């Protein structure tokens, strides 16, 4: 990269940072952070743990966004200094460092811009992701397990926490259905575009004739909603079933009827949860999933 190109890239980055600062409204965000910090120091802050966690998540999200932006600005200023030094006196080693720094900052600015674009009402929420294989038996179930590994690894690489809410293993391989709760700032914003039917065409390892098979898996993505979102669900509209948990888990698996299945009769919407030892906790999680679906 020539010095002329470096200068052009630095000018473009300066404009982007100015635009970001304008859209971020740093002063308003810093005021909100101060408000949240005050809430968190209140003696009764932990009386309502769910509300407390919502405040903590909002605070962490704001702090991360503001701190990352300030870090990007500092990185840009350092690159400007390096550029001036190289312009005054040629230094091959410093030129290489400058070029690498410019490329890295461009990449980080692109990531930051994507985060700013995730500004829809529920983008910042945790995500509930469901995978359901289509017709095709073991072949589709194996494809579902591949997608499960992909989403799990992607989430872990981004620093998100993954919890398995419901898991039904396949008869020979793969999974018949799985529901994940993916926790992290902007988890739903990043994952919402994954909703739809995912198709795989391959020579099947389960077909002794080596024929080509097409497999389908439907993917549902919903935001996890907190109690601030009011959805009227009447008790008489619900059918609640309990059953024994299955799949990977602790000692409670297959020993108690801790798993919950809730059917919303007017819409025939069904949700299941078996991730917790407690039937009460599974019911709470299932109700959150039902609210998200409705």
Swiss-Prot record:
It comes from the Bacteria. The modification N5-methylglutamine is found at residue 251. GO terms for biological process: viral translational frameshifting. Keywords: Cytoplasm, Methylation, Protein biosynthesis. Methylated by PrmC. Methylation increases the termination efficiency of RF2. PROSITE patterns: RF_PROK_I (PS00745). SUPFAM superfamilies: Release factor (SSF75620). InterPro entries: PCRF (IPR005139), Pep_chain_release_fac_I (IPR000352), Pep_chain_release_fac_I_sf (IPR045853), PrfB (IPR004374). Signal peptide: none annotated. One of its GO terms (cellular component) is cytoplasm. Transmembrane segments: none annotated. It is found in: Cytoplasm. GO terms for molecular function: translation release factor activity, codon specific. Peptide chain release factor 2 directs the termination of translation in response to the peptide chain termination codons UGA and UAA. The gene for this protein contains a UGA in-frame termination codon after Leu-24; a naturally occurring frameshift enables complete translation of RF-2. This provides a mechanism for the protein to regulate its own production. Belongs to the prokaryotic/mitochondrial release factor family. This is Peptide chain release factor 2. It comes from Cytobacillus firmus (Bacillus firmus). The gene is prfB.
